Swiss-Prot record:
<feature type="binding site">
    <location>
        <position position="225"/>
    </location>
    <ligand>
        <name>substrate</name>
    </ligand>
</feature>
<dbReference type="GO" id="GO:0019509">
    <property type="term" value="P:L-methionine salvage from methylthioadenosine"/>
</dbReference>
<keyword id="KW-0547">Nucleotide-binding</keyword>
<dbReference type="GO" id="GO:0005524">
    <property type="term" value="F:ATP binding"/>
</dbReference>
<feature type="binding site">
    <location>
        <position position="53"/>
    </location>
    <ligand>
        <name>ATP</name>
    </ligand>
</feature>
<feature type="binding site">
    <location>
        <position position="38"/>
    </location>
    <ligand>
        <name>ATP</name>
    </ligand>
</feature>
<dbReference type="InterPro" id="IPR011009">
    <property type="entry name" value="Kinase-like_dom_sf"/>
</dbReference>
<feature type="binding site">
    <location>
        <begin position="107"/>
        <end position="109"/>
    </location>
    <ligand>
        <name>ATP</name>
    </ligand>
</feature>
<protein>
    <recommendedName>
        <fullName>Methylthioribose kinase</fullName>
        <ecNumber>2.7.1.100</ecNumber>
    </recommendedName>
</protein>
<dbReference type="Pfam" id="PF01636">
    <property type="entry name" value="APH"/>
</dbReference>
<keyword id="KW-0418">Kinase</keyword>
<dbReference type="InterPro" id="IPR009212">
    <property type="entry name" value="Methylthioribose_kinase"/>
</dbReference>
<comment type="function">
    <text>Catalyzes the phosphorylation of methylthioribose into methylthioribose-1-phosphate.</text>
</comment>
<keyword id="KW-0808">Transferase</keyword>
<feature type="binding site">
    <location>
        <position position="332"/>
    </location>
    <ligand>
        <name>substrate</name>
    </ligand>
</feature>
<comment type="similarity">
    <text>Belongs to the methylthioribose kinase family.</text>
</comment>
<comment type="subunit">
    <text>Homodimer.</text>
</comment>
Amino acid sequence: MGYYSLTETTAIQYAKEHGYFEKKANVVCHEIGDGNLNYVFKLDDGEKSIIIKQALPYAKVVGESWPLSIKRATIESKALQIFAKYVPDYVPVVYSHDEELAVTVIEDLSRLTITRKGLIDGEGYPLLSQHIGRFLAHVLFYTSDFGLQSEEKRVLEGTFVNPDLSKITEDLVFTDPFGHYDTNDYESDLQSVIDELWSDKTLKLKVAQYKYKFLTRKEALIHGDLHTGSIFSSPSETKVIDPEFATYGPFGFDIGQFIANLLLNALSREEEKRSVLFFHIEKTWSYFVENFTKLWIGEGVEAYTKEKQWLPIILQNIFTDAVGFAGCELIRRTIGLAHVADLDGIANKENRIQAKKQALSLGRELIKYEAKCADIQLFRTLFQQTVGGVKA
């Protein structure tokens, strides 16, 4: 029959035909997706529920004028299975994948809340940073040359060649927000700050270097879009979802994206309410270092993991890269194609513009002066110095 787009009715038919519900079951289906690239259906018969996710052959946010390969659904399914191999507690269960229809049937996580929404609503999620730090350490280590034999790594790397979605990252994170491109989207009150940003040749040179790192450093399997909208949370659980951007890339990329999205939430808050975000930023890094170090010492397969001076260099490089990637993400999410509710949801215009100016200034500083952030404490200092000097 070939590919066709599911509807709520045909999603029910698909689920019944594949044995997820009895033929006579009274199944309720709702399309619940709010993303840019897929349909997401929740199906429930009152006793059990599942999620059916289908990749569309175009970007919903733009329309059919932006075609995309549906093979990304297979990449997403494989990535979730790789993640589950190393950190099963932090990803949903994948029940099946249909490559022809680009359909993946996965565990329903309705008991949890999208982390971005929870943070905006004031939730703290005390275990978020511990779980994400551990998730990142295990996935990045075990899919790198340090935790995987080089032959196996090369094979796995080939599995995750993801040209369509990697091109989106190249354009929307590293290129378009730094010049006059039609994809950019911002309020006119920001124009003077943006003009200054776009005329900063030192900044552009640094961004060029980070784009080059993304293009060429195939260090480990990365999620590729690890923002707080790609994580479900509760006070006791954390689940990473939507790795359709998964590819081999730099160690620091996912860490930087996650940190940037915590910073965006921090910027949406009054100063005295930001401490929980810095707790998570600092703890994410410390848990990452703790877990990565244990794996390096106990599970390292590369000969030079036995050299004691090598690990500190690796960790410093990862952190420095993460800071720069975080800066790119801050700018992209403020003036690029895909914004975040943390900033756009600020009702008071003056406060919203101030927060966005702060995000742009902070992003610029993190990219240009990432070397100033030699450790997590200096990172916080740079935040305070930069944000404190920006007014609406």
